[in-house]
Structure formats: structure tokens, C-alpha cells
Amino acid sequence: MSVNILLVDDNHIQAATRRAILEGCGREVRIALQGQQALELLSDAETAKNIGLVITDHLMPVMSGPQFVAELRRRGFTLPVVVLSGLPEAESAYEGLDVAFRLKPFDPQSLINLVQEMLGECMRRSA
């Protein structure tokens, strides 16, 4: 069974580019254009059980990355989360939220490697 990735990014171009990269190496990807939409997707039990990794942007309208991740954790989701940001100082906003923080930009192979690493951690946690 393939593990789905949930991409949360208000930038359509960035989301589509990352989706194409990840689908190109055999991953299934869902896109949410903001945090609230992602939480709605995850509120469906069938959808939620197939999501194995969340990749989210830091700066988004309506619900910022830290607000989204805090709400995700408050709702009991323990799945791995990667936060992408161009702002090095943003990492401190995620203290205590159990995320992997990565600075943008990075090349496609780095994204693929990161996903493989995070999903590997996920598999070891559930084993």
C-alpha cells in the first residue's frame, strides 16, 4: 500500500511542482491550499488513515504553519510533519511540535531524499 503525502501550501505553483516531483517517484500526493483545508481533509477517517506524511509551508494566510501544526497535534495526529520555510528564524515557532524544519529553496532530489527519510522513520515508529 502506498503512503500518501499531504502537501499544505497556498502557493499553487510550489504545490504543483512538489506534487509532480513526488508523484514522479511513485508517491501519492494530496494538496491543501491552506491549513484549515488540510484539517478538513484529515477529519475524514478514511483519508487520514492513508496519510503518512505532511509537508507544510510556514507562511500561509488564514492559518499559519505553526497554527496548523499546533492544531494538528492538539487533535491527536502524531504523523511526521516537515515544515518548509525561507526564514531561518521561523524554526523557533515550532518548538515542542515535533517537526522536521527545512529551509527553502532546495533541489528536487533533496525533497525526494527527505520524504524517503521521513517515511522510513514513520515505518520504524509503527513497527
Which ranges hold each PLM region?
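Conserved acidic carboxylate
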Residues: 9
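Two-component/phosphorelay signaling modules centered on CheY-like receiver
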Residues: 12-31, 99
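Acidic, metal-coordinating helix/loop segments flanking the phosphotransfer/catalytic sites
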Residues: 31-53
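Active-site residues of response regulator receiver
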Residues: 57
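Receiver (REC) domain active-site loop signature in two-component systems and cognate sites
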Residues: 60
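Hydrophobic/aromatic residues positioned on beta-strands within the core alpha/beta folds
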Residues: 82-85
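C-terminal output helix
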Residues: 106-119, 123-124
